[in-house]
Amino acid sequence: MGSRILVINPGSTSTKVAIFNEGKISFDAEVSHPRERIDKFSTVMEQKEFRSAAVMDLIKDELAKGTPDMVVGRGGLLKPIPGGPYSINDAMISDLESGRYGVHPCNLGAILAREFAEFWEVPSMIMDPVVTDEMDPVAKVTGLPEIKRRSVFHALSQRGVARSVAAEMGLEYEQAKFIVGHMGGGVSIGAHRYGKVVDVINALDGEGPFSPERSGTLPILPVLNLVESGQYTFDEMRKVVTSRSGVLGLLGTNDMREVQARMEEGDDEARLVLEALVYNASKYICSFIPALMKDDPQKRPIDAIILTGGVARSKLLVKAVEDVVGFIAPVKVVTGLEEMEVMGRGGLAVLRGEMQPQEYHSD
């Protein structure tokens, strides 16, 4: 079997694809989807044909060079499972389509991967889905008995950049301590302690700092008042806090380049929002110091704070965060297609028999 691998990664406002040949990226592309176009769909699943057409448009010229031997999709919101590769099966597709464990465009990753793989009659898989769960039990406890915190984060991105930085620093990932912040349309932060992600900021459930599109942590009673007053239904509120708030709600745009330009032109409101974004991100990064010091008798220092994701491309924002949290550990920035590379490497390892894909079973 060859090792030509197609990787599909649907995000909140973009779709990325990459083609790997013998473990190296031979082609990668990304298409941005304007918010007004995405908002025409009432559900994520309604975007399937739109996203499928976007993928085909990106790769159509590459298909003349040969069809893939495997398709790897971004993992979606499934039940909590260990990390690693998983074959895409009916149980997985059912849970993703129904939104049983949550609704997000990443749910389309496995669905699109399987669709293309079945057309070419090749295997399909996901790698390190966002529901990878290695949280310490103590980190899941809340003050409300009916609610436990969930491990939902950018597992693929965070593990990929953490391993990359560990290698750069001459460390084994399993021997290092990192705080990793993925800053995209949503922000997730993870405490990586000796190879396990023992606590996370779960942006999907509304935790953590606000981001370009999400509200982040909110005082709960005012939120309940908004719903009780009839200003929002439950479904409307869920959509607002997960995709129509944050910088978008405050300034009317989720494009951080536009916000930065407005600030540089003297827009005081844009300046305040950017300063608040940096303050909130820094505050939650610092909140993970206990997670990395807990159960470590040597109290070994944190090796690095790692920033990744689209927002990490802004030198101004990265410098502002570094000025606040740099006293804890060196700040490393990793941008680019790390998620795509991690998925491609995972697919290659499976094709070569170096890793065995696990089977997903629905509860």
Curated annotation (Swiss-Prot):
GO molecular function terms noted in the UniProt entry: acetate kinase activity; ATP binding; butyrate kinase activity
Keyword field contains Coiled coil: no
Catalytic activity reported: butanoate + ATP = butanoyl phosphate + ADP
Any one of the GO BP annotations: acetate metabolic process
Cross-referenced PROSITE patterns: ACETATE_KINASE_1 (PS01075), ACETATE_KINASE_2 (PS01076)
Cellular component annotations (GO), alphabetically ordered: cytoplasm
EC number assigned by the record: 2.7.2.7
Annotated compartments: Cytoplasm
Swiss-Prot/TrEMBL keywords: ATP-binding, Cytoplasm, Kinase, Nucleotide-binding, Transferase
Top class in the EC scheme: transferase
Family to which the UniProt record says this protein belongs: Belongs to the acetokinase family.
UniProt-recorded name of the protein: Probable butyrate kinase
Source organism (scientific name): Maridesulfovibrio salexigens (strain ATCC 14822 / DSM 2638 / NCIMB 8403 / VKM B-1763)
Gene: buk
